[in-house]
Curated annotation (Swiss-Prot):
Its EC number is 6.1.1.12. GO terms for cellular component: cytoplasm. Catalyzes the attachment of L-aspartate to tRNA(Asp) in a two-step reaction: L-aspartate is first activated by ATP to form Asp-AMP and then transferred to the acceptor end of tRNA(Asp). ATP binds at residues 222-224, 231, 484, 536-539. InterPro entries: Aa-tRNA-synt_II, aa-tRNA-synth_II, aa-tRNA-synth_II/BPL/LPL, Asp-tRNA-ligase_1, Asp-tRNA-ligase_1_N, Asp/Asn-tRNA-synth_IIb, AspRS_core, GAD-like_sf. It comes from Listeria monocytogenes serotype 4a (strain HCC23). It holds the Pfam family tRNA_anti-codon. This is Aspartate--tRNA ligase. It is found in: Cytoplasm. GO terms for molecular function: aspartate-tRNA ligase activity; ATP binding; catalytic activity, acting on a protein; nucleic acid binding; transferase activity. It comes from the Bacteria. Residues 200-203 are annotated as: Aspartate. Its main location: cytoplasm. Belongs to the class-II aminoacyl-tRNA synthetase family. Type 1 subfamily.
Amino acid sequence: MEKRTSYCGELNEAHIGQSVVLHGWVQKRRDLGGLIFIDLRDREGIVQVVFNPEFSKEALEIADSVRNEFVVTIKGTVHARGEKAINEKLATGKVEVLAEEITILNTSKTPPFYIEDGVNVSDELRLKYRYLDLRRPEMNNIFKMRHTVTRTFRNKLDALGFFDIETPYLTKSTPEGARDYLVPSRVYPGNFYALPQSPQILKQLLMTAGFDKYYQIVRCFRDEDLRGDRQPEFTQIDLETSFLTKEEIQAITEDMLVDVVKEAKNITIDKPFPRMTYKEAMDRFGSDKPDIRFGLELQNVSDVVKDVDFKVFQSAIENGGEVKAINAKSAAANFSRKDLDALGVFVANYGAKGLAWLKVEASELKGPIAKFFPEDKAADLKAALQAEDGDLLLFAADKADIVAASLGALRNKLGKDLNLINEEELAFLWVTDWPLFEYDEEAGRYVSAHHPFTLPKEEDIPLLETDSSKVMAEAYDIVLNGYEIGGGSLRIYKKEVQESMFRALGFTDESAKEQFGFLMDALEYGTPPHGGIALGLDRIVMILAGRNNLRDTIAFPKTGSAVDPLTNAPGEVSAAQLAELKLETVKKETN
């Protein structure tokens, strides 16, 4: 096989007159009156190859037998295209290759779908034939970008003196939030390893070990319910460092992300990134990961409407809740009664019992609840919401968390539906000053908002033993365009504080020792102050590539039901394998 001289997509006018050897796949073949044209594709793009019997009759005869997706080697000379033959849609569109030789390296069956961008094919079929799906230029470009992003992170961390240190994949099951993927031990029947949800504890132990600056581009595993921006296995840019403040860790993170965006998109991002407290994010946007590319902010109108004779508002306020509104400027004409009813159904998915609304027409409030607003109250409401003719006012009244969840989700929906979002913009945001705990309705108790190793604010440490709901954390999340792309914090580094933390979470001293005894022991041997962050590589690439599903950024992903259609994983294993592990499967009876 002759050595390749160029990639197809690299050829341009500078190569005119040069002899080239190309390897690739036949994208398309056209027979035009004795001439055959082949679009040859490789990872860098497509170039047109011309087979002319006056130049090589033998090559023409072989080209006549090739079909789409055959793998071939072509030797020829680069020529300029005629002015009328230039293809502006191709990067190589000003040149073509006049073929001298062609060798068929392998044939191909007819693919189950066209290997081209924009093809209309189900996700299931794409994943079943993922190796074909990945041939499409748009998919190829995503993984080029992923490589660029990964390389940039690695180069930056190397330059900052971070050590790349691997932590084990077979580790101990510890409660970190989601369910673990468990791996049975053959040597110790009845015992299990867990695949790590993150290297959290182990990277902290590396700080105890004195490495000072650690990073790892690491796979993590969580057995959780899936959605578009989650997968059961995913990749983190994980880092930890000693003796730095959270502001210094944030500055390192910003430097990395600015470099990544510049390398991947050639866009310059200003720093420092804007900062917002958790409370402000929830109050203004109804989300702890707000998309700040557009307005539609939530506004508390409880004081304005508390005396209005509308029972829905009154009862919410009397029961300790609140009334908030979104003013969708100039949007009243966009929404019919039917459309607004549909928005009511939408917010019900987030716990809201309904969605009240008003339109402003000829300086007056119009809508089902307008009758509850006498002239003075109507004026107060319009002033509070800066409402003008043509505006649509949308209200939720309930407990604060339900109002935030429902109006926060509605805000995001309206931002898209009303085309308020600049899809080219990249809006980074730090969300800081988190509560250390959040209340879990299902469990009926407080749980860690991030993880059990997050350092409380120093002034709040005594509250761990008395009123843990009021404890604030030295935690910080990084948000991009409404997606959380990373979470970090300073960590607990003193044993007595970690013990208080476990007690606040409901651990007995015995259960804490059983689960985390090795960490507690390490904290007695001079663990330094430390902190870090984990950034979601898949999610960052998804956003930079303009996709809306993590599957597009992972070479061999799972479906929304955690199945791999390519390999048919998960699958059953043999009785012999189970016996070796001292395991039996229990099958549910079906009617």
